């Protein structure tokens, strides 16, 4: 994968996601305890985390686009297939570190020490490249769909040059050329067909350019990026190295050669792959619930031990909070620590704990009055604002906090202008 991704970006790219370290830790324990066979199975929690992140990439790529939900679901479905094979590759690579040179099972401490660099490479290097490419391809797919709807006004598309400082040569011959939007060219040649490609498309009514010389060019997409996602409905194609070369080598239900004599590999529409994904999703749902409950109780007990509940706690460095007071109640803690809506990962929950323990490190960045930026003509928004006002909420203070090498945004409700209480945690 390093050779495939090596030219993905001129400089390291900071992906706006956090791979939940607690889920990775749980996956390592499951692998060590042989709770699943990494040769033909995947860890449900590990899969769900990879799938969540790549699904988030699709959402980010589409933004506030008015593209139909069904098309977005189709693209997300394709990232689930990719996630299943990526998770299998991760499990297989990590399982290779279970035994020592004598074939004996290592201590868990040694196994963890040996395997963390591999996990880090999969996540910090490869997944970031995959995430950024998924965002770009989803965005371009949304653009293509939108431009097709307006083809009666602007019937052609121009290939826009890459915005990268160091442009790669493969797509340079396409720069500033114009094709009809329904030209077959776009099915096989499309921006985003190279890892972290930063080329683009734009609609135009300019005349078509002479593209006859393009036929002689042998510009092949990178492995895993074949085809226009707006045409195929796939963010990643199944020729990516994570995928098997053919059905006989598939880890998810190997079949005899005679059974697939007339079959063509189609991972995105394979019933066996879908069955693996469905099983992993069902198991992950319950395991996430159990994991969240376990850590919620740990966090709750720790905060209660350090600060107590139902009490206004004076901050050691009052200037770090605008009001100088932080109130921790069972209600506010449950809101932030038990569910997903306000703190979507275990890391975000532990970030809140660390911030409460070290309030002097909070950096105030903004304040918004209750209702600011909301459409109060919308009955739902209006009711939500009124409900908060009844609780005494007058506004929100936003703070930055460093945790695990990332910058987080913490939102605190301001109650009657007197004190603050935790409300949400999000990655900056």
Regions found by a protein language model. Give the residues of each.
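N-terminal leader/targeting and assembly helices and adjacent pre-domain segments
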Residues: 1-119, 206-355, 359-428
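N-terminal start-of-chain detector that recognizes signal peptides
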Residues: 66-71, 127-133, 168-174
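Conserved short secondary-structure elements within globular domains
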Residues: 134-208
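Short, charged low-complexity intrinsically disordered segments located at boundaries
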Residues: 125-127, 143-145, 161-168, 200-202, ...
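Internal glycine-rich, Lys/Arg-flanked active-site/core loops of soluble domains
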Residues: 100, 108-133, 137-153
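A broad, low-specificity signal for short, low-complexity segments enriched in glycine/proline
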Residues: 55-57, 117-121, 155-165
